[in-house]
Amino acid sequence: MSEQEKDQNNAEPQVETVEEQQAAAAAEAVEPTAEEKLAEVEVELAKVKKALAEADVRAQAEVQNVRKRAERDVQHARKFALEKFAGDLLSVADNLERGLAALDAEDDALKGAREGIELTLKSLLDAFARYNIEQINPADEPFNPELHEAMTMVPVPNVDPNSVIEVLEKGYQLNGRLIRPARVVVSKAP
C-alpha cells in the first residue's frame, strides 16, 4: 500500500467519526417540545415574580422608614423649637429674681414694686410651665453633674460632701433636655 492509500484509509475513518459525532450531537440536541419551553418560561416567570415581590417589600419598608424618620424629625422640631427663645428668656427670669432679692421686704414704699415684680415673675414661670420649661433648683440636693455646674467647692462641717449648699443661678430644662445647668456651690469634706 502506498502512503496515499494509507492516508485515505486513515482519513476516511476520521471523517466518519466526525460525521458520527455530529449526528450523535444532533440527535441529543433534539429541539425541546412546546411543553418543555412553556415549563422553562414559567420557571423564569416565577423567578422574576419573586424578585419583584422582594423588591416591592423592600421599597415599602423604605417608604415606611422615611415616613417614620420625617415624623420623628417634625416632632423633634416642634418639641425643641422654643429652645433658643427660652434660653434668651432665662436671663429675664434671673433678673426678676435678683430684683426681688435686692428689694427690702420691710420697706413699705417698695411694697408695690415688689408685688409687681413677683407677679411678673410668676407670669413668666407660668408661661415656662405651659411650654414644658422646668426650673432646676437643686438646693440641699446631691450634686448631679448632668444637671448642675459646680462653680466652687467649699468645706462645710455637718453637711454631706458633694451636696449643693447654694444655688447661684437656677437651671432649666425644655422637655427633659437641659437648656442651662444650675450653677451651684458644692460642699466638700472639711
From Swiss-Prot:
Protein name: Protein GrpE
Quaternary data: Homodimer.
Family stated for the protein in its record: Belongs to the GrpE family.
UniProt source species: Alcanivorax borkumensis (strain ATCC 700651 / DSM 11573 / NCIMB 13689 / SK2)
Presence of keyword Repeat: no
Domain of life: Bacteria
Compartments, as annotated in UniProt: Cytoplasm
Gene3D superfamilies for this protein: 3.90.20.20, Head domain of nucleotide exchange factor GrpE (2.30.22.10)
UniProt-listed InterPro entries: GrpE (IPR000740), GrpE_coiled_coil (IPR013805), GrpE_head (IPR009012)
SUPFAM superfamilies for this protein: Coiled-coil domain of nucleotide exchange factor GrpE, Head domain of nucleotide exchange factor GrpE
Keyword hit for Cytoplasm: yes
Region (Disordered): 1-33
Keywords: Chaperone, Cytoplasm, Stress response
